[in-house]
């Protein structure tokens, strides 16, 4: 169960004296490094995202998700899994590439309103919000590289990345139980008479962090059926879900999910199955683990990208696992955002930064949950390699250089789906 007493480090990134080269910058830079070394993430206070803009992005998401399904389905992109996703009407999401650039957001709104000029107000709100999240990402990446003495690589590093924004909606859990279980969702779907879903069988629950889940819009859930999704949560069975493909439900199988352009979710096979979830983490989950796994909206995983900046607004759900195996329940606060390091950053920093396991539990009833996130991803063909300055006798090279896309080819291979630690299995230096 997530602890309310444990909290992530809170770091103020909006101090007026926070300028590169200043004493305040050095102080905050040290705090950021320590937080990422110890937790792999932190809560960033950033009041440059005004409350007015926060409310505007919330209203924008409400307006967008209120559109007819056929309208939202116009959100398509040549790159796979960047557009609209609908997971059994339990959750849905919209995706935009490099949303910090207004032209890209205009293309997105023109997809939804092709007969006009898009929607200027919505475009501007999304672009302004994405721009602020990108500011946080760039500041944190500068601080990280400076703190390790590799600031000479900053400009090239920033040019080697791109952003994926995803707007997400989750329906409120059924009334009567704030601690909603997977079975509750199955029962709800049965009552709604959604095609392909029967009570007390596999149910798809959408992800949140790095949770652009690559899934086909429909899920045929049922014992012996195929699941056209990535992250499946199955009653008493595990799901071996292959990225963007049909996966057979199988006892003891693993879940391997891909997210928007490689922001990955990896939930391994060969681990203990928690009663009535079938969704297990890379760590063994005992059936009596406080029954917490029953309440997951996203099983325990690490991100595969560089950084994620998440806006939870008022409804909590994110939980982060500490080094000593305790869970921190992250409670949203005004003007705060969660910054999470991914496996790619861990490799780039030669293991000096940890990529934390985290999960999402959907527990608050009666309120629809909206979240927005920016995912920082390496551009195609970018090779991730720790700089020589981070390799010495005390810190031997931990990972071989690798192409980001090649990592995901392995990640979704038959062998990759059976492995607990994808990054280590794919590119760890054997002598390390």
Curated annotation (Swiss-Prot):
Q: What is its EC number?
A: 1.14.11.-
**PROSITE patterns on file:** FE2OG_OXY
Q: Which UniProt keywords apply?
A: Dioxygenase, Iron, Metal-binding, Oxidoreductase
Is the keyword Iron assigned to this protein?
A: yes
Name any cofactors this protein relies on.
Answer: Fe(2+)
From which organism does this entry originate?
A: Arabidopsis thaliana
Identify the residues that the record assigns to the Fe2OG dioxygenase domain, covering every copy. 281-378
Q: What is this protein called?
A: 2-oxoglutarate-dependent dioxygenase AOP2
Quick check: keyword Iron in the entry? yes
Which Gene Ontology terms describe the biological processes this protein takes part in?
glucosinolate biosynthetic process
Query: How is the co-factor bound, per the entry?
Result: Binds 1 Fe(2+) ion per subunit.
């Amino acid at each position: 169960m997530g602890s309310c007493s444990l909290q992530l480090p809170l770091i103020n990134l909006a101090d007026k004296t926070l300028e590169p080269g200043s004493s305040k910058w050095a102080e905050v830079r040290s705090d950021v490094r320590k937080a990422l070394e110890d937790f792999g993430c932190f809560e960033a206070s950033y009041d440059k995202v005004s409350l007015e803009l926060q409310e505007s992005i919330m209203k924008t998401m409400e307006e967008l998700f209120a559109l007819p399904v056929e309208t939202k389905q116009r959100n398509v992109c040549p790159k796979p899994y960047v557009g609209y996703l609908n997971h059994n009407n339990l959750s849905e999401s919209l995706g935009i590439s490099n949303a910090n650039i207004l032209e890209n957001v205009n293309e997105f709104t023109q997809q939804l309103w092709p007969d006009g000029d898009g929607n200027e107000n919505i475009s501007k709100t999304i672009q302004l919000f994405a721009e602020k999240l990108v500011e946080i990402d760039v500041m944190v990446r500068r601080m990280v590289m400076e703190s390790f003495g590799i600031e000479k690589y900053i400009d090239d590093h920033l040019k080697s990345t791109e952003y994926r924004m995803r707007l997400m909606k989750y329906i409120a859990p059924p009334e009567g139980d704030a601690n909603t279980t997977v079975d509750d969702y199955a029962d709800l779907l049965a009552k709604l008479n959604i095609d392909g879903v029967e009570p007390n069988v596999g149910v798809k629950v959408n992800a949140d962090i790095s949770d652009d889940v690559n899934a086909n819009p429909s899920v045929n859930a049922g014992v012996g059926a195929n699941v056209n999704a990535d992250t499946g949560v199955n009653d008493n069975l595990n799901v071996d879900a292959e990225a963007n493909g049909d996966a057979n439900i199988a006892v003891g199988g693993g879940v391997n999910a891909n997210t928007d352009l490689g922001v990955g979710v990896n939930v391994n096979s060969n681990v203990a199955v928690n009663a009535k979830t079938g969704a297990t983490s890379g760590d063994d989950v005992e059936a009596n683990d406080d029954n917490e796994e029953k309440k997951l909206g996203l099983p325990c995983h690490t991100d595969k990208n560089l950084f994620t900046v998440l806006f939870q607004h008022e409804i909590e759900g994110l939980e982060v696992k500490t080094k000593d195996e305790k869970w921190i329940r992250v409670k949203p606060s005004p003007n705060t955002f969660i910054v999470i390091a991914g496996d790619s950053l861990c490799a780039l920093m030669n293991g000096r930064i940890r990529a934390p396991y985290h999960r999402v539990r959907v527990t608050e009833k009666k309120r629809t949950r909206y979240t927005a996130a920016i995912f920082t991803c390496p551009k195609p063909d970018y090779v991730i390699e720790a700089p020589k300055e981070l390799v010495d006798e005390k810190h031997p090279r931990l990972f071989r250089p690798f192409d980001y896309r090649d990592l995901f080819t392995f990640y979704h291979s038959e062998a990759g789906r059976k492995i607990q630690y994808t990054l280590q299995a794919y590119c760890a230096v054997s002598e390390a």
